[in-house]
Curated annotation (Swiss-Prot):
Subunit-structure text: May interact with Ccs1.
Descriptive protein name: Cytochrome c biogenesis protein CcsA
Listed GO biological process terms: cytochrome complex assembly
Organism superkingdom: Eukaryota
Keywords: Chloroplast, Cytochrome c-type biogenesis, Membrane, Plastid, Thylakoid, Transmembrane, Transmembrane helix
Entry function: Required during biogenesis of c-type cytochromes (cytochrome c6 and cytochrome f) at the step of heme attachment.
Topology class, membrane: Multi-pass membrane protein
Record bears the keyword Thylakoid: yes
Organism whose genome encodes this protein: Daucus carota
Family membership: Belongs to the CcmF/CycK/Ccl1/NrfE/CcsA family.
Length: 324
């Protein structure tokens, strides 16, 4: 009873703090001069990380196993992973644009985990025999860490695409204001093509101060997106391989083409394509960003969408799971 009450308190404290943090982030995005608020938001995320850490430890103590056995616990661990990714640049004194994305991701996952949709599986249950293995820690933790990193990297790529489109659109409109309304009908590739033609014929200077800042921001987004996705890809690979070994021990086969396994493989393929296009110097940065943006949807289908089906070998922790 005490552990359950403590867990309930920590869950809502962490959610409340992260709500305040995301509000501060939105304010600092509008007013860059408020440095104290920015520092407060970073300290708030550290407090959120500590609350979620204590929450996981508490649940581990009274359940007798690492809290990774169902959808609720995996969502809490996903929030912890996103919080960890958020505070790493802070301790390295390296300011990045990852913070706004990770903070918003934490509030989404933490909010959903504490919502009424998962009420049936908030209480810890005894592990089914198939999950009573040392591979549970290795496989699930690597997969969740991989999901967290890939989600953050994918969102950075989405932001990169938005900024690139706006930059190309603004450049085109500055060179010919009459095309302001027409650009809304152009595709991303068409706008880039028109900008290249305008540059060939020697129009006005390519970069204004605003466009220069935007170009620098795009480069930073690409830098962090590539590195975070690379880290997530490593975690995902380790998670899939450890899961295959565990499956062979539990079911006598390394691969069964279970829905979760199939979508995990699709996720791996998508981000392998991303890494290939990103390292290919003949391709533009936007090409790899488009692949990563597609990967964002694939991850949610793999992680969350398959649980809605309630079929296959990975049905533990779906909405139909109840406490024993």
């Amino acid at each position: 009873m005490i552990f359950s009450t403590l867990e309930h308190i920590l869950t809502h404290i962490s959610f409340s703090i992260v709500c305040i943090v995301i509000t501060i982030h939105l304010i600092t995005l509008l007013i860059d001069e408020i440095i104290k608020l920015n520092n407060s938001s970073e300290k708030g995320m550290i407090a959120t990380f500590l609350c979620i850490t204590v929450l996981l430890v508490t649940r581990c103590i009274y359940s007798g196993h690492l809290p990774l056995s169902d959808l609720y616990e995996s969502l809490i661990f996903l929030s912890w992973s996103l919080s960890f990714i958020h505070i790493v640049p802070y301790f390295k004194k390296n300011k990045s644009h990852l913070s706004t994305i990770t903070a918003s991701s934490v509030i989404f996952t933490q909010g959903f985990a504490t919502s009424g949709l998962l009420t049936e599986i908030h209480q810890s249950a005894i592990l089914v025999p198939a999950l009573q293995s040392e591979w549970l820690i290795m496989h699930v933790s690597m997969m969740i860490l991989g999901y967290a990193a890939l989600l953050c990297g994918s969102l950075l790529s989405v932001a990169l695409l938005v900024l690139t489109f706006r930059k190309n659109r603004n450049l085109l409109c500055k060179k010919n204001p009459l095309l302001l309304k027409l650009t809304e009908e152009f595709s991303f590739g068409e706008i880039q093509y028109i900008n290249e033609i305008n540059n060939i014929f020697g129009n006005a200077s390519f970069f204004s101060d605003n466009n220069y800042y935007r170009s620098q921001l795009i480069q930073q987004l690409d830098y962090w997106s590539y590195r975070v996705i690379s880290l997530g890809f490593i975690f995902l690979t380790i998670g899939i391989l450890s899961g295959a070994v565990w499956a062979n021990e539990a079911w006598g086969s390394y691969w069964n083409w279970d829905p979760k396994e199939t979508w995990a493989f699709i996720t791996w393929i998508v981000f392998a394509v991303y890494l290939h296009t990103r390292t290919n110097t003949n391709l533009q940065v936007e090409n790899s960003a488009i692949v990563a943006s597609m990967g964002f949807l694939i991850i949610w289908i793999c992680y969350f969408g398959v649980n809605l089906l309630g079929i296959g070998l990975h049905t533990y922790g779906s909405f139909t799971l109840t406490s024993n």
